[in-house]
Amino acid sequence: MKAAVLVFPGSNCDRDLAVGFRSAGFEVEMVWHKETALPAGIDVVGIPGGFSYGDYLRCGAIAAQSPIMRAVADFAGQGGHVLGVCNGFQVLCETRLLPGVLMRNGGIKFVCRAEPLVVASATSPFTDGYSIGDRIAVPVAHHDGNYQIDDEGLSALRSEDRIAFTYADNPNGSRADIAGVLSANRRVLGMMPHPERAVDVAHGGTDGSVLFASLAAALVAA
């Protein structure tokens, strides 16, 4: 199995995300934002956290226009798996690979702590190692993690079981406590919390490792 982890100017969690993938047995290749194609044989693309392009204009807005994101959009359109974490979630929303927007936190403060999440959907390659209702601890670190979506979009997410994770104690004002959402084909996941920071007991817990292991198992079984 092979993962491509994108690197933008201002990314600072790309190596962390690579560690997350490697913990589940993935070979990882780092891909610079100016590349126009993904490496051959890629099974999943990871879009990391950080402050791509300094978060100018809007978080993820400039990164969404980078050459490599055209290749990622094509990859996703062909049924490829994509995981966007924190700034990566913002990029996925800016490219319209996922619905909704990420806005400034409701408290207008940067939030950085382990956050309790509730697994809302266990029927995706990323989440089928969990059970619905599981409470897991995953770190958050963001200033613009307030997920918003209109009534029609929220209704669609709910009816199609596309809300992957919710916050047990909403830290940022996200509508419906949403912490992560899935694409219609369930192969693109965007989430503000950092599962790659919860794959080692020495770092405080391993609840995030289930996500990477779930994806690995799904790819092996495919």
UniProtKB/Swiss-Prot annotation:
Domain of life, source organism: Bacteria
Entry keyword set: ATP-binding, Cytoplasm, Glutamine amidotransferase, Hydrolase, Ligase, Nucleotide-binding, Purine biosynthesis
Name of a matching Pfam family: GATase_5
Biological process, per Gene Ontology: 'de novo' IMP biosynthetic process
GO molecular function, one term: ATP binding
One GO cellular component term: cytoplasm
EC number(s) reported in the record: 6.3.5.3, 3.5.1.2
Glutamine amidotransferase type-1 domain segment(s): 3-222
Active site: C86 (nucleophile), H194, E196
InterPro entries: Class_I_gatase-like, PRibForGlyAmidine_synth_PurQ
Pathway: Purine metabolism; IMP biosynthesis via de novo pathway; 5-amino-1-(5-phospho-D-ribosyl)imidazole from N(2)-formyl-N(1)-(5-phospho-D-ribosyl)glycinamide: step 1/2
PROSITE patterns xref list: GATASE_TYPE_1
Gene3D superfamilies documented for this protein: 3.40.50.880
Reaction(s) the record says it catalyses: N(2)-formyl-N(1)-(5-phospho-beta-D-ribosyl)glycinamide + L-glutamine + ATP + H2O = 2-formamido-N(1)-(5-O-phospho-beta-D-ribosyl)acetamidine + L-glutamate + ADP + phosphate + H(+); L-glutamine + H2O = L-glutamate + NH4(+)
Subcellular location: Cytoplasm
Function: Part of the phosphoribosylformylglycinamidine synthase complex involved in the purines biosynthetic pathway. Catalyzes the ATP-dependent conversion of formylglycinamide ribonucleotide (FGAR) and glutamine to yield formylglycinamidine ribonucleotide (FGAM) and glutamate. The FGAM synthase complex is composed of three subunits. PurQ produces an ammonia molecule by converting glutamine to glutamate. PurL transfers the ammonia molecule to FGAR to form FGAM in an ATP-dependent manner.
Subunit structure: Part of the FGAM synthase complex composed of 1 PurL, 1 PurQ and 2 PurS subunits.
Protein name: Phosphoribosylformylglycinamidine synthase subunit PurQ
